[in-house]
């Protein structure tokens, strides 16, 4: 392929190591071109991280790449095969509307998957058109970048391109393609697919590839596959704790949406909790509350058990011993998660050291928040700045008694009051992607072609711990007329 000056200048440096795995793992895809691609948003800071030139990315040649109209040298576009437990039921899945362009190698030697989401049908489309509409792609862009700013491991969004073509859902909608960036797209469901339909040799090849790509430091230990289980558990324990600490509800925690890298992936029906309630569910398809806020840690443990099951043939030649090894590791997940969560909750309350009664102090606050329908984010924000007024919770006798116990707890630690307050302000975001704010930005962009609302929202969300005056209006919870909020997967 002849390279243009624009392509050379852009900084594309693609490899396709995934294509070296057995052919059962993927299908090589010829991209489906679109008629009139247009770049509507570009993540310039992320482009810099990837070693890409933002100006050159906006050229016609690069636009053709981001739209799936053109392949790059070093790229071998493919759709990945995987399976998954969806709401507890096993299913054969795969990239039904996405293709992996390849792996961008940055100037520092890091490797990131570049995936086009909404790029057209694949052998795994299961009758779908393989396309995506603009609203859900912009939504993933907003929330994934907000998660990154919050310090939560996540896939990210490089660009959104409109296709100039309509996609048919309940009505005709503008088509779009998102360029998703990830440490990799290896999922628990990837291992489930090979464990179900592959050989032990293919399973070993996948595990070895994963170790080399994500955990090279444990590759030489006595039982590297047990170490793989341990590392994935550690990553997910830290991730789910961070979700809980900011009130994030994923909405579709199927095993195909749990990454091996420990990144959050798939922002279809997700949302952030307003009033604190462990039973909060936003997804329109989660009618039984399987993936409710309070269930997320337990579901993560269930998913990890499915992951460990796939590796049983590699853990030990004796099946009973392999099962015991896996069970021992899975049993540690909730304890590990809880340790991360408790440390994070202490920080949200300005607590530096550990005392036995800390957990009961935290749980008592959460019970009062639930009883009084207190806003989760704003309650901790108010505690951080000692602005304890204007809500039902702060006017109760229960809270006054709790507040006295909390102040006494802070006085028992060596750190100063100012240090505690700074810890709280660094641990409690002032702004989150409030559901009504996200919807307002999407309405302006999709219905009116006005991206200024979205750009302003992205700017505010990029500094969640700044607590600046211009963020004040974005801290407001939704009006009662905007509740209850429902999300849809957008597929």
From Swiss-Prot:
ATP binds at residues 94, 96-97, 117, 129-130, 180, 187, 266. Belongs to the SELO family. Its EC number is 2.7.7.-, 2.7.7.108. Its cofactor is Mg(2+); Mn(2+). It comes from Alkaliphilus metalliredigens (strain QYMF). Coiled coil: none annotated. NCBIfam families: PRK00029.1. This is Protein nucleotidyltransferase YdiU. The keyword ATP-binding applies. Keywords: ATP-binding, Magnesium, Manganese, Metal-binding, Nucleotide-binding, Nucleotidyltransferase, Transferase. Nucleotidyltransferase involved in the post-translational modification of proteins. It can catalyze the addition of adenosine monophosphate (AMP) or uridine monophosphate (UMP) to a protein, resulting in modifications known as AMPylation and UMPylation.
């Amino acid at each position: 392929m002849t390279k243009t000056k624009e392509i050379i200048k852009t900084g594309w440096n693609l490899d396709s190591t995934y294509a070296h795995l057995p052919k059962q793992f993927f299908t090589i895809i010829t991209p489906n071109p679109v008629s009139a691609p247009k770049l509507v948003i570009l993540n310039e800071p992320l482009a810099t991280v990837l070693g890409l030139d933002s100006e050159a990315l906006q050229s016609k040649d690069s636009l053709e790449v981001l739209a799936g109209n053109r392949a790059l040298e070093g790229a071998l576009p493919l759709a990945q095969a995987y399976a998954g437990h969806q709401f507890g039921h096993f299913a054969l899945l795969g990239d039904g509307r996405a293709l992996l362009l390849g792996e961008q190698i940055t100037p520092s030697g890091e490797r990131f998957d570049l995936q086009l989401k909404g790029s057209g049908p694949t052998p795994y489309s299961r009758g779908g058109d393989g396309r995506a509409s603009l609203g859900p792609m912009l939504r993933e862009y907003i929330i994934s970048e907000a998660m990154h700013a919050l310090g939560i491991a996540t896939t990210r969004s490089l660009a959104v391109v409109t296709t100039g073509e309509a996609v048919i859902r309940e009505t005709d909608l503008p088509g779009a393609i998102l360029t998703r960036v990830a440490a990799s797209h290896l999922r628990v469901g990837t291992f489930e697919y090979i464990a179900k339909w592959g050989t032990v040799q293919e399973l070993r090849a996948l595990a070895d590839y994963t170790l080399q790509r994500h955990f090279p430091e444990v590759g030489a230990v006595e039982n590297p596959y047990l170490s793989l289980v341990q590392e994935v558990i550690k990553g997910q324990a830290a991730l789910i704790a961070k979700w809980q600490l900011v009130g994030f509800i994923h909405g579709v925690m199927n095993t195909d949406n749990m990454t091996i890298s420990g990144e959050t992936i798939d922002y279809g029906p997700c949302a952030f909790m307003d009033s604190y309630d462990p039973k909060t569910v936003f997804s329109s398809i989660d009618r039984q509350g399987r993936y409710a806020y309070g269930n997320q840690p337990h579901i993560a443990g269930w998913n990890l058990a499915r992951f460990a099951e796939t590796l049983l043939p590699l853990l030990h030649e004796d099946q009973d011993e392999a099962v015991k090894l896996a069970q021992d590791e899975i049993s540690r997940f909730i304890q590990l998660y809880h340790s991360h969560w408790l440390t994070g909750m202490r920080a949200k309350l300005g607590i530096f050291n550990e005392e036995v009664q800390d957990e009961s102090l935290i749980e008592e606050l959460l019970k009062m928040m639930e009883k009084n329908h207190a806003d989760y984010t704003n309650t901790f924000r108010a505690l951080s700045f000692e602005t304890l007024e204007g809500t039902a919770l702060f006017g109760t006798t229960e809270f006054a008694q709790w507040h006295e116990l909390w102040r006494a707890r802070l006085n028992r630690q060596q750190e100063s009051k100012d240090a505690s307050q700074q810890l709280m302000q660094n641990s409690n975001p002032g702004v989150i992607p409030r559901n009504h704010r996200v919807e307002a930005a999407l309405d302006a962009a999709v219905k009116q072609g006005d991206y200024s609302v979205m750009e302003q929202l992205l700017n505010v969300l990029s500094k969640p711990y700044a607590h600046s005056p211009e963020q004040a209006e974005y801290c407001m919870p939704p009006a009662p007329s905007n509740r209850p909020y429902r999300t849809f997967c957008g597929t």
